[in-house]
UniProtKB/Swiss-Prot annotation:
One of its GO terms (biological process) is protein transport. Belongs to the SecB family. One of the proteins required for the normal export of preproteins out of the cell cytoplasm. It is a molecular chaperone that binds to a subset of precursor proteins, maintaining them in a translocation-competent state. It also specifically binds to its receptor SecA. InterPro entries: SecB, SecB-like_sf. GO terms for molecular function: unfolded protein binding. It holds the Pfam family SecB. Homotetramer, a dimer of dimers. One homotetramer interacts with 1 SecA dimer. This is Protein-export protein SecB. Keywords: Chaperone, Cytoplasm, Protein transport, Translocation, Transport. It is found in: Cytoplasm. GO terms for cellular component: cytoplasm.
Length: 174
């Protein structure tokens, strides 16, 4: 049996762009290349929703999950902040089965894998484009984030013993 993530919605939950040292920073940029630090965090929460089964007339508890991809980028030139960009981009997902009854028979670890690896991989291109647009609209060259390997990020945290608590549905990469 195979499973897939079904995207129900995606949206910007929080977006902040600060350009605290303009216009001086643009003069500094003409003489030096900024140092850019980026951090990435993925988290998920369960959103239980009651649904009516039209065929049997019964109520079922169907789980939706909100996955948040948070990216923080800070650029500095000679210890002066050029810009700070912070975004929390979310998606609401459900897990679908190819079985006729759509019964989900996944372990907790398999669900975490889908939510912390597959889901952020779906969200990342949108975050990347939003950050590039925000930086270029603020007078800087567009910041094109490198592709993030969410599988490796997740596996590294498992090796370090982080996120092994059943209630911890997050992954960090700094």
């Amino acid at each position: 049996m195979s499973y897939k993530l079904d995207v129900k919605a995606q949206y910007i939950k929080d977006l902040s762009f600060e350009n605290p040292n303009s216009p001086q920073i643009f003069v500094m940029m003409s003489k030096a290349t900024p140092e850019i630090n980026i951090s990435v965090n993925v988290s998920s929460i369960s959103l239980p929703v009651k649904t009516d089964d039209q065929k049997s007339g019964t109520e079922n508890l169907s789980s939706l999950y909100e996955v948040t991809l948070q990216v923080n980028a800070e650029a500095r030139i000679q210890n002066t902040v050029a810009f700070i960009c912070e975004i929390k981009y979310c998606g609401v997902f459900s897990i679908k089965s190819d079985a006729e009854n759509n019964e989900i028979d996944l372990s907790h670890q398999e669900v975490k894998d889908m939510l912390l690896v597959a889901a952020p991989s779906i969200l990342f291109p949108f975050v990347r484009e939003l950050i590039a647009r925000a930086t270029s609209s603020s007078g800087f060259p567009p910041l094109m984030l490198d592709i993030v390997d969410f599988r490796t990020m997740y596996e590294n945290q498992l090796k370090q013993g982080v996120g092994q608590n059943d209630n911890d549905n997050s992954v960090d990469n700094v």
